[in-house]
Amino acid sequence: MATGTPAAELRELTEEELVSRLRESKEELFNLRFQMATGQLDNNRRLRVVRHEIARIYTVMRERELGLATGPAGKGDAA
């Protein structure tokens, strides 16, 4: 899969799911960099896609922190 997750899809996730996605993406980026260093990386574009996905996750988290966007509908609005 050479495409990242759209921001709209990330905005539907809860905070815990975003943190989990972030951890997974960072792990993948680490592994891709390791493969690149050892000359085993076949798809260089995947590095860029994963970096952009990490940036999207951070952006969604920051939007919520600043109050520019809310979490998924129905979660936390009732309290």
Curated annotation (Swiss-Prot):
In terms of superkingdom, the source organism counts as Bacteria
CDD domains, sorted: Ribosomal_L29_HIP (cd00427)
> GO CC annotations?
cytosolic large ribosomal subunit
Q: Which HAMAP family match?
A: Ribosomal_uL29
Alphabetized UniProt keyword annotations? Ribonucleoprotein, Ribosomal protein
Q: Which InterPro entries match?
A: Ribosomal_protein_uL29, Ribosomal_uL29, Ribosomal_uL29_CS, Ribosomal_uL29_sf
SUPFAM superfamilies per the record?
Answer: Ribosomal protein L29 (L29p)
Mind listing the GO biological process terms from this record? translation
Q: Show the GO MF annotations.
A: structural constituent of ribosome
Entry's family note: Belongs to the universal ribosomal protein uL29 family.
Q: Does the record bear Amino-acid biosynthesis in its keywords? A: no
Q: Known Pfam families for this protein? A: Ribosomal_L29
Q: What is this protein called?
A: Large ribosomal subunit protein uL29
What does the organism's lineage look like at the top? Answer: Bacteria, Bacillati, Actinomycetota, Actinomycetes, Mycobacteriales
